[in-house]
């Protein structure tokens, strides 16, 4: 079993890599050589005594380094693997430029639940399975960590009070009922509201959230 690395250790490693990348015009060969950034997590001795989320999320430096691994493929095969069509190269390009607000705004054009999808989507079977970097390294687990980057900018938006609510189209006067307040139900409700319709969400249980509340568990989200 490999030694657990603290957030501080991973940040130090990322800072050394970033020092060699900052201000440099990178070739694809340079990008292939950047190691995937490991996700910081609670130390085993600590997480054994709590039910908090194990994964802690990238630091800003880690996110910048990881984003630089993306070679901005013209055909964007990663996007083809995303069920909701997130503009993946575009949001990663914003991260490369240090524009985290631009990154999250790009994601939310098609996905209003990036903090959830960044945590629980099976990226290794979807977007990352199509990533050119992953194919070059013969493993989707070594692809550009798209989900971790999505999570980073979603968490950054919340932590920095930068959340913006999409402006709906003019009211149509139509009313729509959505049954269930899980991720799917909330996504449908949000998309319908964006089109100008009035939406009421019905939930049978005491709390909203569906599988996020009743099945997945706090250790993962």
Annotate each PLM feature:
Residues 2-175, 205:
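Ferredoxin-type iron-sulfur electron-transfer modules and their immediate structural context
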Residues 91, 183, 210-211, 216:
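Gly/Ser/Thr-rich helix-start
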Residues 112, 182-184, 207:
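Residue-level detector of alpha-helix initiation sites
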Residues 126, 187, 210:
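Conserved SAM/SAH-binding loop-helix junction
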Residues 150, 190-191, 211-214:
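Short acidic, glycine/serine/threonine-rich loops at helix termini
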Residues 174-201:
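N-terminal Rossmann-like FAD-binding beta1-loop-alpha1 element of flavoenzymes
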Residues 197-213:
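Glycine-rich FAD pyrophosphate-binding loop
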Residues 219-221:
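Conserved small/polar residues in nucleotide/adenosyl-binding loops
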């Amino acid at each position: 079993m490999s030694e657990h690395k603290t957030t501080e250790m991973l940040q130090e490693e990322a800072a050394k890599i970033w020092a060699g990348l900052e201000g440099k015009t990178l070739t694809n060969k340079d990008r292939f050589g950047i190691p995937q950034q490991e996700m910081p997590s609670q130390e085993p001795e600590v997480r054994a005594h709590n039910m908090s989320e194990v994964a802690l999320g990238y630091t800003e430096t880690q996110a910048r380094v990881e984003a630089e691994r993306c070679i901005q493929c013209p055909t964007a095969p990663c996007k083809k693997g995303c069920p909701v069509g997130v503009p993946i190269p575009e949001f990663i390009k914003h991260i490369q430029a240090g524009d985290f607000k631009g990154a999250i705004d790009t994601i939310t054009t098609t996905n209003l639940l990036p903090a959830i999808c960044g945590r629980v989507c099976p990226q290794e079977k979807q977007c990352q399975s199509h990533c050119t970097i992953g194919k070059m390294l013969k493993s989707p687990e070594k692809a550009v960590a798209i989900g971790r980057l999505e999570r980073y900018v979603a968490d950054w938006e919340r932590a920095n009070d930068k959340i913006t609510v999409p402006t709906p189209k003019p009211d149509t006067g139509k009313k729509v009922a959505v049954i269930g307040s899980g991720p799917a139900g909330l996504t449908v409700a949000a998309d319908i509201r964006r089109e100008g319709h009035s939406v009421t969400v019905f939930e049978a249980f005491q709390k909203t959230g569906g599988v996020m509340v009743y099945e997945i568990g706090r250790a993962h989200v």
